[in-house]
A protein has these predicted regions:
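Core catalytic lobe of class I
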Residues: 1-260
Length: 260
């Protein structure tokens, strides 16, 4: 059974994702695939809403590693077929299986099409004393071909950065020494371009606390700020985005905000 909720930019479909994609999503039509699958935590993930006296949950328990990897492999293969030649795929995971999923992505897409490992870093609090506190998740980025679309993002310089000094142009003098490039009046040549700092692969974005306004009651909901950044890297307005697992629906909301 399929259940649809649709507006001008978002379509939510309740169905077996692999079957639906095979039958209804056109090959080579998708610009961005974002997957936030079960993490192989071997737990039932539950989010309880006290005010509504109800809970939302999904089962992340598997018979074995092979069952889990076979499930993800089938999804990745179908997703690859739906991606256009400039598309990127982002796979969200944690330490439960990130090492396994990297190998699986190499298998499906090819080692040469690996682009980045994003580390989503955040603050968490725990009384655990038996190991280091878990405070990050991983997002693997792969492309379908070498002709992928990638849009650079720049962040602000730190307050202590001397921006003018960074942007001043340099050259080598007659002795091969690097010196500031100067105008005819001996002033230092600068530039009007101040794009900022290129985005790194470590993203420090707050984890959604239980009382966050954007919380919808789904146990593994991701922040809109995180998802918007993924879209901004890989998409232009009106590009097609595919989220096979959907979860809380936050990617669709993020895409709507950015008019994708």
């Amino acid at each position: 059974m399929n259940s649809k909720a649709k507006n001008s930019t978002i379509e939510f479909i309740l169905s077996d994702s692999v079957e639906y994609m095979q039958e209804n999503v056109q090959n080579s039509s998708v610009q961005l695939v974002y997957l936030d699958p079960p993490f192989f935590s071997q737990k039932k993930q539950v989010q309880y809403n006290k005010s509504q006296n109800k809970s939302v949950s999904f089962n992340d328990k598997w018979k074995c590693r092979e069952e889990y990897l076979d499930f993800i492999r089938k999804t990745l293969i179908v997703c690859k077929n739906k991606m256009n030649d400039s598309a990127l795929i982002f796979l969200h995971c944690d330490t439960s299986a990130n090492h396994l999923l990297r190998v699986l992505l190499d298998e499906v897409f090819g080692e040469n099409l690996f682009l980045n490992e994003i580390v989503w870093s955040y603050k968490r609090w725990s009384n655990s004393s038996k190991k280091l506190l878990d405070a990050h998740q991983t997002i693997w980025i792969y492309s379908k071909t070498k002709n992928y679309k990638f849009k650079s993002i720049y962040t602000s310089y730190s307050p202590t950065t001397n921006v003018d000094q960074i942007l001043q142009q340099r050259e080598r003098d007659n002795n091969g020494v690097v010196v500031y490039k100067r105008n005819e009046d001996d002033s230092i040549v600068g530039t009007t371009e101040k794009n900022g700092v290129p985005l790194r692969d470590v993203w420090e974005i707050p984890f959604l606390n239980p009382k966050a306004k954007e919380r919808v009651g789904y146990p593994t909901q991701k922040p809109i700020e995180l998802l918007k950044r993924i879209i901004q890297i890989s998409c232009d307005e009106n590009d097609l985005i595919l989220d096979p697992f959907c979860g809380s629906g936050s990617l669709g909301i993020s895409a709507s905000i950015l008019k994708c």
